[in-house]
UniProtKB/Swiss-Prot annotation:
Residues 1-32, 45-162, 493-578, 614-682 are annotated as: Disordered. It catalyses: L-seryl-[protein] + ATP = O-phospho-L-seryl-[protein] + ADP + H(+); L-threonyl-[protein] + ATP = O-phospho-L-threonyl-[protein] + ADP + H(+). It comes from the Eukaryota. Residues 59-97, 614-646 have a biased composition (Low complexity). It comes from Saccharomyces cerevisiae (strain ATCC 204508 / S288c) (Baker's yeast). Present with 300 molecules/cell in log phase SD medium. Involved in regulating the activity of the plasma membrane proton pump PMA1. Transmembrane segments: none annotated. This is Serine/threonine-protein kinase HRK1.
Length: 759
């Protein structure tokens, strides 16, 4: 127990000894009031070590009593101590007579003042009471041992023993150096918390109270460096809580340091109240203060397991991103930074409300009535989520920027289902390539705007296609022979139109989709409902026929970006992408384009054969002509068949020659590139290309390596895409407000395995 208060709490100057001598005279003034103990002032019983004891009004009685106490400790040598009594009494009277006039001339008003403690020292001594002493702490057993070893009472400055102390110092000069070490504290030692005098938090120092109030601890939910979390069901009402059991106290760690670390998290969490921040309820410790328990709100859904299912829709991902950012914004408004944001420190309720947990690494960056930002220091957090400045500028960094970087990494994990890199260090190839400048400059804002226009066009064409399909369903009710006759009559005279119609209806080879269309199709698949499945399939058919025109109409930068995106769609985690598929696709499309443009006669022959087959299938449909006309038609058909066979052999040789030339070109390119024929993409685009177009403008700023260029929370909330996100939340009465357009994925552990639900 620290020495919080000395025996004379309101007398700290050497000149006060003169007043002590005067107050203990044989004829004390009548105006003197014997004050109560300081401990009586704070609600305790009166102490024998009070400022001016009521029992010490007579100086001779007090001196005799103190001398008798000294005599008892000195082997009951009454003769020698009676002499000491006479000496001390004579010295006392002489000092009183010689100094009485001197004290009155200085205007001292100890006699006339009705208040016993000095007004100039009351507040300072009160603060000293609440501040732990720096001196060495001694237990009661040590104090008693020192008393018996020196055979004398502890030195004191009380009014009844001043001369005895002077006499004791004359005989034992070495004893005065250890005055504060021998001084007994005015507050007796207690087994209560060491924080009970300086903190208003009521900490239960008995883990039995935890079991009585909340019940016994249940199964383990998770564990980490700071401790483990277990579930707890209160037997009285069946309410479920999560109890965090902090790590045990280390052998070289003091009780005060351990209590400070454990209670700091509780002090932070108990003051935070937000829909996206976990509620902290209570705190306990065992009798020896070697363990602490924190009672919190229970959320049954593990957010990390939800992300790893890969079943989150785009709307659900955006909703979780906004909820996460709302929680971080609230923390920053309170002057706190989390510094350990990650998927593991996010939990969800059964209604899809995301909450932040674990404030063990939180730090205060803005104090009340201060505008400046207090920099943080130290490497705190998990490696994949760390900001680069935490490693490069360990001694001083802005913790707000660290939280914003972690938000961007969490969003990448939700979209990609993997980490962008293991740690933001130069030794990590992924991060090193990310820090390099882009191979081609990318305008993410313009790309997002163009992509939005493309989506609008596709929606309009999808609607037109649906209307056309309805009309075609009506036309199918007509006789089949009439429709076939019309197609024959329309295709025979105008062969280029028939070629165009054939290519529009049944293209031989379809170009591969660009990254935009792939993302859109995947998004539509994820966000589609049973009512919209037909629209999604129609959308895919339309996009396949329009890729060439959209790529050509795009900006040059956008074209390069899309080309890189096509080339990187199947890349591995290192960003090395096989471009062979892309080159093969381009070669095939070139060959098909040449074949479609140059082989009109071949296509005409195919059309004629189709007409003949239709005529043979339905002989009644062929108009009745003269025998001469029939012979001429048969001759023309034979000639066309011969030409078709010749051209077919000719084009086979041409295609073989082209195939050999393409193979030789590929071999030469592979030899020129070396054994690794994969393209490596440099710069932030290697990561941003995998994210949705609409999110790239703000994500490119959130994931800025330089913290000075990184986006702030105001920039995030002012972003057009982020502001348009509809997120679920709760009102003041804890009622869930669901956002439209998406469902939340829930993962529960049932029957020893995980079950996935949608709410």
């Amino acid at each position: 127990m620290p020495n919080l208060l000395s025996r004379n709490p309101f007398h700290g100057h050497h000149n006060d000894h003169h007043h002590d001598r005067e107050n203990s005279s044989n004829n004390p003034p009548q105006l003197i009031r014997s004050s109560k103990s300081f401990l009586n002032f704070i609600g305790r019983k009166q102490s024998n070590d009070s400022l001016r004891s009521e029992k010490s009004t007579d100086s001779m009685k007090s001196t005799t009593t103190t001398t008798n106490y000294t005599t008892t400790n000195l082997n009951n040598n009454t003769h020698s101590h009676s002499n000491a009594t006479s000496i001390s009494t004579n010295n006392y009277n002489n000092n009183y007579e010689t100094n009485h006039h001197h004290n009155i001339s200085h205007g001292l008003h100890d006699y006339t003042s009705p208040a016993s403690p000095k007004q100039t020292h009351s507040m300072a001594e009160l603060k000293r009471f609440f501040r732990p002493s720096v001196n060495k702490k001694l237990s009661m057993s040590q104090l008693r041992s020192k008393k018996h070893s020196t055979h004398s009472p502890p030195p004191s400055k009380s009014t009844s023993t001043v001369n005895l102390n002077n006499h004791y110092r004359a005989q034992h000069p070495h004893g005065f150096t250890d005055h504060y070490a021998h001084t007994q504290s005015a507050i007796p030692p207690s087994t209560d918390s060491i924080l009970s005098l300086s903190n208003n938090i009521n900490i239960y120092h008995d883990d039995c109270i935890l079991a009585q109030k909340y019940g016994k601890l249940g199964k383990l939910l998770g564990s980490g460096a700071g401790g483990s979390v277990k579930v707890l069901v209160r037997p009285t009402d069946g309410a479920t809580f999560a109890v965090k059991e902090f790590r045990p106290r280390k052998p070289n760690e003091s009780v005060k340091e351990y209590a400070k670390k454990c209670t700091a998290e509780f002090c932070i969490g108990s003051t935070l109240h937000h829909p996206n921040v976990i509620e902290t309820v209570d705190v306990f410790s065992d009798s020896k203060q070697n363990k602490y328990y924190e009672v919190m709100e229970y959320c049954p859904i593990d957010f990390f397991a939800v992300v790893m299912t890969g079943k989150m829709s785009r709307g659900e991902i955006n909703c979780c991103l906004k909820q996460l950012t709302e929680g971080v914004k609230y923390l920053h408004s309170m002057g706190l930074a989390h510094r350990d944001l990650k998927l593991d420190n996010c939990v969800m309720t059964s209604q899809g409300i995301l909450k932040l947990i674990d404030f063990g690494s939180a730090v205060v960056f803005r104090y009340p009535f201060e505008d400046g930002v207090t920099m943080a220091h130290g490497i705190v957090g998990s490696d994949p989520y760390l900001a680069p400045e935490v490693i490069t500028s360990t001694k001083s960094y802005d913790p707000q920027c660290v939280d914003i970087w972690s938000i961007g990494i969490i969003y990448c994990c939700m979209v990609l289902k993997r980490f962008p890199w293991k740690a933001p260090r130069d030794s990590d190839d992924n991060f090193r390539l990310y820090c390099m400048p882009d191979d081609i400059e990318h305008d993410y804002v313009e790309s997002a705007r163009h992509h939005e226009e493309l989506l609008k066009e596709r929606k309009e064409k999808r609607q037109r296609f649906l209307n056309h399909s309805d009309c075609s369903a009506i036309n199918q009710q007509q006789p089949a022979h009439e429709s076939n006759l019309k197609t024959v009559q329309n295709q025979v005279p105008n062969t280029p139109a028939s070629i165009q119609g054939k290519s529009d209806n049944k293209p031989d080879i379809v170009e591969e989709e660009t990254e935009e269309n792939k993302e859109d199709d995947s998004n539509n698949d994820k966000e589609s409902t049973p009512d919209n499945d037909k629209e999604s399939t129609i959308d895919i058919k339309i996009s396949k026929n329009e890729n060439k025109s959209t790529v050509v109409s795009a900006n040059p930068k956008k074209v390069d970006a899309d080309a890189d995106a096509d080339c990187d769609a199947n890349g591995d985690s290192n960003g090395r992408v096989d471009c062979k598929a892309n080159s093969d696709c381009n070669d095939k499309t070139d060959c098909n384009a040449n074949n479609d443009c140059s082989n009109e006669s071949d296509c005409n022959a195919k059309v004629d054969t189709n007409v003949n087959t239709a005529a043979n299938a339905n002989p009644d449909m062929v108009p009745q002509n003269n025998p001469q006309q029939q012979q001429q038609q048969q001759q023309q058909q034979q000639q066309q068949q011969q030409q078709q066979q010749q051209q077919h052999h000719h084009h086979q040789h041409q295609n073989q020659d082209k195939a050999h030339s393409i193979a030789s070109d590929n071999k030469s390119s592979q030899q020129h590139r070396g054994p690794h024929h994969k393209k490596i993409i440099h710069g932030p685009y290697r990561l941003l290309r995998l994210l949705p177009h609409a999110s790239r403008p703000i994500m490119s700023r959130i994931l800025q390596v330089d913290p000075k260029k990184r986006a702030t929370l105001d920039d995030i909330f002012n972003d057009e895409w982020f502001a348009a996100i509809a997120a679920c939340t709760m009102d003041s009465k804890n009622k869930v407000i669901r956002a439209p357009g998406h469902h939340h994925t829930l993962v529960r552990e049932e029957n020893a395995h995980l079950e996935t639900y949608k709410v």
